[in-house]
Amino acid sequence: MPTPRMFLAAFLFSAVLLLADANAQTYSLLHAFSGLADGGGPEGQLIEDASGNLFGTTNWGGDGHCRNPGCGVVFGLDPSGVLTVLHTFTGKDGANPLGNMAYDGSDALYGTTADGGALMDCVNITKPVGCGVIFKLNKVTGQFTVLYRFAGGADGAGPNGLIRDAEGNLYGATGGGGMAGCGNSGTCGTILKLDTTGKHTVLYAFTGATDGGFPIAVVVDKAGNLYGTTNVGGDLNCNPNSGYGAGCGTVFELTAAGDFKVLHAFAGGKDGEELASYATLLLDPAGNLYGTTPYGGVQDCSGVPGCGLIFKINSAGKGTVLYSFSNGNLAYGENPYYGLTNDRAGNLYSTTTYGGNPFACYPGGCGTVDRLDRNGISTVVYTFENQADGKYPTFLTSDSAGNLYGATVGGGGYDASGTIFKIAP
């Protein structure tokens, strides 16, 4: 029997649809993954080349290595919607690609896998031996090269994405390895550099204390300074009993000279909480940093402390909450796990993993795409319905024409395993 709460949810959802329609942008499905040879669970941010081709990875699928359902693939999607698998991981060359790839602007893609690589220090009975790899793939010829295999000790384990500087050096983070001190997981992660000769260097090893632990992929400025976030550590009075270690995470700077500084330690509640985030920071030309936290904010979120927020840290290090996602209206989305992209007008776009239509993925919703304008007004751009459009959106990419490209890790029709989509202005 319908309850008053269900009628209220339906009314609020309809009201948001009216707001979204007033600012309508056009959604198109570009590809639905089968979970077989073409992969499944696309999670990293898509890369667009000058010809309009999109490139990305799937966390699983492929040809059946890594037991069922496969170790993942690297794919290309041309402007006509034809998907080509550029590389299928087998375990020894990496497994389960995670995080964003980097692109040299010509032919080379660089990425990471969370597992695989065949070194013996990281063993999981459901996956191949290995602590992850850094790889290079020529998107034209298909030539694949493992540039570095992680051993799982001081060098790190479980890399989660890359960024490339103007000289061709690669930078990234590992969620494990490094120093001990992060709850039940033991090690706290590292920041790394791989130079153009293939030399791997640990630039910083986290302790899990006030400096943070479990870092998320970094961004780099023109001066070579790195910025990123951690999932734990910082304010150790926040979430002190977490099995992953105390603290709600940090925003940090690692200068080109090697000096480490915490720019902000999340305090939980209205200030935000990074636990379990995949979000990479967005760096603007003025040196301001923008990001999301999946938890925290102004309201309780179905028993969890807050539905997440969008924040800014200016070049002087001052932090500001720009927007808090609210459980008061589920249709506006909840839990922005995957960070931000922007357009030329200065709008910020995010995805929420939950929220939207509460009846599509009952009771939490299948996620939304949202726009935050320069006046702080948030608008729902698209609501996922768990039909052909998929569910649980991840990272977004924007182009110079104002188009948004993104992926969902699930849905896309019966027995489908995620989608690639486009939202045109």
What are these model-predicted stretches?
Residues 2-425:
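Extracellular beta-propeller repeat domains
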